[in-house]
Structures are given as structure tokens and as C-alpha cells.
Amino acid sequence: MSGLLTLAIGALFYSSGSIARPDLQPLGPNIADKGSAFYHFTQRQYDSADGERHYRVWTAVPDKTPPAAGYPVLYMLDGNAVMDKLDDAFLQQLFAGSPPVIVAIGYQTALPFDTAARAWDYTPPLKTHEPRAGKPALPPRKTGGNDVFRQLLTETMVPQTEANLKIDPHQRAIWGHSYGGLFVLDAWRKASLFGIYYSASPSLGQALQSPLQASQSLDAVRFRGKSLYLLEGDGKARGEPSGHEASLEVLRQTQQQLASKGLTVAFWRYPGLTHGQMFEVSLRSALLHLSGQAALAHQ
């Protein structure tokens, strides 16, 4: 790739790597508990090979005959928080199109996020950052386990989920936000099992090696039939470090450069939305888009 792209990617990954702290209030009943007029839900549980992490996976199947090619399917990280954001009015909206199977991959917790587990599961080796002035240092988390988690996902969770379902493998998609977005981006770079990748507000500044920088030598042939969507808001939350607007521009230029090399990559920019606000907006956009409908308004 061009020297301009190399410099642009480098600038993005040397930008400040602040991590937003998620809301960790216990969740109430979700749509699977309440029931839906449009989808039916099942659950499975899994344990990591080392016994350290424990997963709860919700599968939502439309009460509608699958298309001839099979249902689209969207695997969604941070599944506890995803399930908390779904309601029957939105599922009805999906039902009006070609509704996807929804697979929400969460953890065996009452909280929206298992911060320690996701820090390991969703990340490559990460940078460490000195705390900003006036901010307490966060306790260190174990990171760098994305290859291990991806193996569990693609070799166990996906085959078991799809065993008795008619799925269109070309419409097998994955979505993640923040650390989850970083996981999705790295999975795309490694041309994994999925055909469609939705990377929302990826925590790019945290990686020791940028997944995009590592993509400079990608062979476009390996990515034939694969699509990457980069979703980011341009709003700045209080206390967020400077440089976000420059990072957005770099991300846009990166998308253009990758697309010019024959890769199917799109950048969706959401005016005024902050990192945290992008969680719900991006998951709804991905589900709508996969159902054949227009994603929520973006540029």
C-alpha cells in the first residue's frame, strides 16, 4: 500500500487510547425472558478451555420461513448488553425484511459486560497507558486472548448454533463494539469464517500492532466475497482526549485506500454520536442492514 496509507494508519494508532468505562448496573429481564411475537429464543452455555470464562449464548430465530438460500445470521459480541437493547418493536421491524438469526454471545453474569473476560477474549496484545492527570489508574486486565476465543467461536459455537438451522453462509456476519469492534477487525484481517464484518467504534488505539497496519500486505483474492463495515460516531464525550476528529479522517482515508485495492470496505460515520452511544445505534444498524433494510442514518 501507499506510503500515505502507512503514515495515516500509524497516526491513528499513536492517537490516545482512552477506554470508556461501561455501565455495570445489573440487568433486568431481557426480550428472551419476556417473549417475542416474532422470534423464539434458545440458550446454550460454554466454558473456556482453561475454565476461566463462562459464556451464555442466546439464539433468536425468526418465526418465519427461511429464504431459499437460508437465513442471514449475525453473531453479536457483548451479548448480555445486546439482549438488553432488543425489544419486540425492533424485532417486528426486522421481521418486515429478511430477518436474520441473532446470536448474542455473552457471559454468565447479571451485568451487561464481564469486563475482565471481554478484555481477554476480544483483544490482541495491548498497549499500556499512563493514566491521565487527575484520573485513577485502572487495575490491569489480562489481555491478548482473541485467537483463543475466535477458535471457540468458529469451531464450537458457530457449528452448534447452525446445526439445525438453514443458514446462508454468504450472509454469516459478526458485529462488535469497542474491544468487540477490535476483535471483529482482527477477524476480518485473518479472513475468518464470516462473510460480513461490522466493526463499531473499534478500540484501535489499544493494539500493540494495528490490525489495519498489518493489513498492508493483504491479498485481495483471500477477501473475495467478504465485506467490512467500519462504524464510528464523530461526537466527543466529556473528558475524552483530543484527536478524535483526526482519527476519524484517518479511518476514512484508510477505508478509501483499502477499497482502492479491491477490498470491500465501507465507512459509516454517525454525526454527533459518542463512543458509548454507538453501541445501540451500531447494533441496530447492523441488524437492519443484514435484514435488507436501510441502516440508521449515517454519512
Model-derived segments and their meaning:
Residues G3-Y14:
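Bacterial N-terminal signal peptides
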Residues G17-Y71:
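A domain-start/cap signature at the N-terminus of enzymes
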Residues A69-L152, T156, Q160, N164:
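Serine-hydrolase catalytic machinery in alpha/beta-hydrolase-like enzymes
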Residues K166-H177:
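Alpha/beta-hydrolase fold nucleophile elbow
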Residues G181-A191:
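Short glycine-enriched nucleophile-adjacent loop
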Residues L193-L204:
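A conserved short beta-strand
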Residues G205-R269, L273:
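The feature captures the conserved acid-bearing segment of alpha/beta-hydrolase catalytic domains
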Residues L273-E280:
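Catalytic histidine-centered segment of alpha/beta-hydrolase-like enzymes
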